């Protein structure tokens, strides 16, 4: 929806289950937010998240002292380790038109030896994320490598920083008629392909 002066929806919140609004009503949700859509302060431990915002914005604050707004192609990598609290709110900054949010969040369970590692937070700004273009294929490399492209330095104590890990996170856009073959995973690894039409 359009935003108001508090970056919340410029629409009635009547009839919504504020604090737990996961029903798509009028084309949007509040999630756990009561004034601004999103997820107020909450704890995590023992895993890491990779948050990819293709459209819209996320306001992040955490117990490590990090705070800021990211979006429009930026990626946030957070290793919760022994524990971190954070909030992820989705400000509706456009007051004259609808605010679209297109966000993917991937959770990785850390291996036993890293579950109590120090928490870590890293931003991958969209202009720093490697992009490989070839034959109607545009591939953004968040983690791993593909052909001549390699990801930016991964966070420490992350699946992406382990030399024995086959972790790859790629955002692939194909032109009509383009063909891309998913590279074979190393023995003992799995690949997951999520197709999304935006």
Kindly label every feature range from the protein language model.
Residues 64-72, 90-93, 120-123:
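"Short basic amphipathic alpha-helical interaction patches in structured regions
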Residues 1-51:
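N-terminal, Lys/Arg-enriched amphipathic/low-complexity engagement segments
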Residues 81-113:
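Ligand-binding loop in jelly-roll beta-barrel domains
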Residues 48, 68, 74-76, 86, ...:
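Generic beta-strand structural signal
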Residues 102, 109-197:
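Conserved, well-structured core segments that form or line functional sites
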Residues 66, 90-97, 128-131, 158-161:
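A generic local secondary-structure boundary/capping motif
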Residues 61-62, 79, 86-88, 115-118, ...:
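Short helix/loop capping segments that flank catalytic or ligand/cofactor-binding pockets
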Residues 45-65, 71-75, 81-85, 175-176, ...:
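Glycine- and acidic-residue-biased ligand/ion/polar-headgroup-sensing regions
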């Amino acid at each position: 929806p359009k935003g108001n002066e508090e970056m919340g929806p410029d629409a009635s919140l009547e009839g919504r289950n504020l604090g737990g609004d996961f029903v798509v009503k009028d084309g949007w949700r509040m999630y756990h937010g009561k004034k601004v859509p999103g997820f107020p302060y909450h704890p995590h431990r023992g895993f890491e998240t990779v948050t990819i915002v293709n459209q819209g914005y996320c306001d992040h604050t955490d117990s490590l002292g990090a705070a800021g707004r990211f979006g429009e192609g930026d990626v946030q990598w957070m290793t919760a380790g022994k524990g971190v609290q954070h909030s992820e709110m989705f400000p509706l900054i456009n007051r004259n038109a609808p605010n679209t949010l297109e966000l993917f969040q991937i959770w990785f369970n850390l291996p036993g030896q890293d579950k109590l590692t120090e928490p870590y937070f890293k931003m991958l700004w969209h202009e720093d994320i490697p992009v490989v273009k070839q034959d109607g294929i545009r591939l953004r490399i968040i983690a791993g490598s593909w052909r001549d492209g390699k990801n930016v330095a991964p966070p420490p104590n992350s699946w992406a920083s382990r030399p024995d890990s086959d972790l790859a996170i790629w955002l692939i856009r194909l032109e009509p008629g383009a063909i891309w073959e998913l590279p074979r995973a190393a023995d003992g690894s799995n690949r997951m392909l999520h197709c999304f039409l935006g």
